[in-house]
Structure formats: structure tokens, C-alpha cells
């Protein structure tokens, strides 16, 4: 994971040095100052960028340079939580007591989702009934889609399909939605067939690089394009064209990353094995 993070963070550092980030001005035009304006609005330091890339994002969730890196801490440390649970409680009768205690401990953290995902994959008495109930799985599929689409920023949902949901549970809607959706997909052959089409397999292949790159493209090229073209074409048409261009550029850069950057992880691992 680290080599790709490092390469992209170096690109972000250079973009900041060159003054290519125009997200603050674009946020004013788009009316999204509350979320989009504050990213990368500081003087970059090569040393702090290295710290974030090499260990900060994995151990502490540091994401000053690349805002999306906060999830890597959850995935990295969360995996060790799952490994520990599997080693200590796998197949044992008392595991549900341990699961309940861990759930309470993690209740107000972002690790709750990855822990519940592990629990969902373990064996339990009535799991087979849930897996084989087609109607219930389609219902979970629909419910999962609904909750996964809850506005991620936690605001701007008034008057939408999600406006009826109490704000007090905002931190749990996506977790609940993902659990329902993934469980349903694992048990619905027709959905699996649809998601097995080449376009989805390709997006899965480039997903890691695409995730790390997309915000860089949006905050630099996307913001510049919006500010430059909007006075000529109007807001709506400019945003539509911008969406297409951002998507093409992001996918293209992700493909290059998959071919030439991500393999560095394998080479680094092989080198360490030889030592």
C-alpha cells in the first residue's frame, strides 16, 4: 500500500508547491465552502509529506496532504483487530460475549464497520436461513443502497430522501447500509452476475489507485476548469463537462499507477524477503 501512497503524495506536494490547488475559490463558486474549501490550504513540507506517506496515514490516520488517506488507518489497524479476534475466539462458544464487548468499545469509532464485517463473515446458527431467503436479501439490498447513499458530509440532506432519518445516528447509516448491501450481494447470484461484467472488474482492478488519485484531480484540474469555463458555459453545463473530463483523467492516471506504481509494492516485498 505504501509505495502508491508515497508516489501520489509526492505529486500532491509538487502540485501544492506550484499553486495548482484551486479548490478554495471553486468551493465558493459551488457553494461548498463548509467541506471543500479547507483542503491543502497550508504551506507544504516535504518532511511532513514523507511522514504521512510512510507511516502517518497507516498508524495515525494522518491525511493532511491527501484527504482520503484517513481510511487507511481503519483498514490497516482494523485488519489486526480482525486477525486477533479470529485467533483468540474463532469457533469458541464465548466468542459472542467477546463480540459484544468489542462492539461496545468500538461503538463510537470508525473501526466498528470493519469489526462488524468480520462478525458477518463468521459462522452463526441462523446465518444459513438469512443467506437462503431471497426476498429478505433483496430487501437488504434495497435498504443497503438507501443507507449507503446518505450524504457523507452529514449536512445538506434536508428535503431529500434521507431527510426523514434522525441526525443523531448519522455516524452509523453508512455502516448499516454497507453491511446490508454486502451481505445481500454475497447471496444474490443475479447481482453477482451483473457486478462481474468487465467494466466493474476493471474498476475493481484500478480502485485503489483511483481512490488515492481522484481528489488530486478534482482539487486541481477540476477546480481550474470550473473557474475558467463557468463564466462562458454556465454552471450546469460546465459541471457536466467537468465530470466527464475528471473521470477520464482520473481513470487514465489510475491505469498508469496500476501498471507502473502499484507493482513497486511487490518488488519491495520481494526485496525484504531476500534480506
Question: Which positions does each model-derived feature cover?
Answer:
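Alpha-helical transmembrane segments of multi-pass membrane proteins
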Residues: 1-8, 86
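Membrane-interface helix-loop-helix regions
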Residues: 5-76, 80, 180
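C-terminal "closing" transmembrane helix and its immediate cytosolic amphipathic cap
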Residues: 7-11, 15, 117, 121-132, ...
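Hydrophobic, aromatic-rich alpha-helical transmembrane segments
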Residues: 64, 68, 164, 168, ...
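Hydrophobic alpha-helical transmembrane segments
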Residues: 73, 97-100, 112, 176, ...
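Solvent-exposed interhelical
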Residues: 76-103, 123-134, 231-234
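Alpha-helical transmembrane segments and terminal signal-anchor/GPI-anchor hydrophobic tails
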Residues: 109-202, 216
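Histidine-centered divalent metal-coordination motifs
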Residues: 208-214
